[in-house]
């Protein structure tokens, strides 16, 4: 055996030992790791201390660039029937004749989620809380879900 092969054997043995030590460390602290993950799971996609948003970049959606919770779009059950997509900006809207806007309602939560978080840019928004309708039922509902 020459010195080069001995060197590679020592390096390989050290690497294997480090892997075993790391594996044993994880094995010994597995309960603590699970407890830490359970405690901090709600903060997984929250804004980090450094000011950079910690975002899930695997899937692009409308909430990725928003850090204010009230501005984020969400699907909520609408009184009576169906679901609506809401944020502080208002509701996703259906545009009718003469450019009249009404709240877009969905039959299921899955339909609401698919529409709200699809790749299509949904720019039709109906905000019932602008003058002169500040105290109507739709505005009160919007304020209650934010």
From Swiss-Prot:
A GO term from the CC aspect: viral envelope
Pfam families found in the cross-reference section: Pox_A28
Keywords assigned: Disulfide bond, Fusion of virus membrane with host membrane, Late protein, Membrane, Phosphoprotein, Signal-anchor, Transmembrane, Transmembrane helix, Viral envelope protein, Viral penetration into host cytoplasm, Virion, Virus entry into host cell
A GO BP entry: symbiont entry into host cell
Protein modification: Contains two intramolecular disulfide bonds. They are created by the viral disulfide bond formation pathway, a poxvirus-specific pathway that operates on the cytoplasmic side of the MV membranes.
Record membrane topology: Single-pass type III membrane protein
Source organism, top-level taxon: Viruses
InterPro entries the UniProt entry points to: Poxvirus_A28 (IPR007664)
Residues passing through the membrane, by range: 1-21
Primary localisation category: virion
Location in or out of the cell: Virion membrane
Cystine connections: none
Topology feature Virion surface, residues: 22-146
Subunit structure: Part of a stable entry-fusion complex (EFC) which is at least composed of proteins OPG143, OPG147, OPG155, OPG086, OPG094, OPG107, OPG104, and OPG099. Formation of the viral membrane is necessary for the assembly of the complex. Interacts directly with protein OPG107.
Protein's job: Envelope protein required for virus entry into host cell and for cell-cell fusion (syncytium formation).
Family indicated by similarity: Belongs to the orthopoxvirus OPG155 protein family.
Protein name: Envelope protein OPG155
Gene symbol of the encoding locus: OPG155
